[in-house]
Amino acid sequence: MTGRLCLAGALIGVAGGLVTAFIEPAVGPDRYSYPYTPTGLVLAELTFILNHLLLLIGVLGLARSGAAGQGWLGRVGLWTSMVALVALTLCEVATIALADSAQPTPRTDTLGMAYGVASILIGVGLVLAGIAVARTRLWTGWARHIVLTSGIAVFVIVIPGVFSTFLAGRLVLVIWMLMFAALGLALIRSPHPATTR
């Protein structure tokens, strides 16, 4: 079940990223809701919140699968990822409160830093958990490396992409969501336990 929910969450993220990337802007880039109207941003944020919660379920499923083993590396990585995903979800909630705001402002800058910290911690957590998964060898083939790949991607493509153009930032997030979709598939095919499917 957690695998299917993670896959669904990732696909929601893919759809949201593509819509945000290619929708006709309704406001100028000086508005925090860009490219959406304030109401549109609220609706988008609700889907992003759902996306993050479903990905959180996926990471919880990874923890329950035993694929990361019982060592400290896997435990620290998984807990770091889960706490950071909760923090990222709270950032999305805070964004709703700024839907009518101009940008940049001290509040939008602070929220931007919070997004950055949460994203970095997700990356760190996934790298640690991914190393543990690779060492444990419960998963085989591409699944053995997908968690580590997802963590490394935060630093290699996500962060550089977000600091590039608006379009590039959205597209790298779509790529990252596809990696979470692969995690969902890995959980579905995982032999232990049945609840990960």
Outline where the language-model segments fall:
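Hydrophobic, aromatic-enriched alpha-helical segments typical of multi-pass transmembrane helices
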Residues: 1-197
